[in-house]
């Protein structure tokens, strides 16, 4: 019989959620520096805002946070959709950001030097 070895420790799940929670907490208080704690310095983001494609460096997100301020009523659900020893994908279901909009984000994370970081964010903004 082959060995059945658990390759992903529970602590990785906790660290991944904690990483994405930095993003959420930064949005709540309206501080891009707090949001940035979740992201790799070279991270990118792409998605549709009001029907127009927005894409490029994660600085676009930081600018949005700086321009629009706090999101005290933000509500989120975080789900790890996939995980390997060095990669993960997290879905962020979000309601009421700083401009009152709702989104679904998919964040791709990588574990480098023992630390989980978001390297890509793709999102869908809902109308209404």
Where are these regions (language model features)?
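Short, low-complexity N-terminal intrinsically disordered segments enriched in polar/charged residues
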Residues: 1-33, 37-41
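Short beta-strand segments enriched in hydrophobic/aromatic residues
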Residues: 39, 94-96, 122-123
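Residue-level signal for short amphipathic helical patches enriched in basic/charged
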Residues: 30, 97, 113
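Short beta-strand edge/turn micro-motifs at domain boundaries
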Residues: 102-128
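Terminal "cap-and-tail" regions of soluble proteins that handle hydrophobic small molecules
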Residues: 2-4, 56, 117
């Amino acid at each position: 019989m082959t060995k059945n070895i658990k390759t992903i420790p529970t602590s990785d799940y906790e660290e991944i959620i904690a990483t994405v929670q930095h993003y959420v907490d930064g949005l709540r208080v309206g501080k891009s520096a707090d949001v940035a704690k979740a992201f790799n310095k070279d991270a990118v983001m792409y998605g549709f805002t009001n029907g127009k494609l927005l894409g490029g460096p994660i600085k676009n997100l930081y600018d949005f946070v700086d321009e629009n301020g706090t999101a005290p009523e933000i509500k989120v659900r975080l789900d790890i959709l996939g995980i390997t020893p060095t990669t993960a994908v997290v879905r962020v279901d979000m309601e009421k950001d700083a401009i009152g909009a709702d989104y679904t984000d998919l964040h791709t994370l990588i574990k480098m030097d023992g630390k989980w970081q978001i390297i890509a964010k793709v999102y869908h903004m809902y109308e209404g």
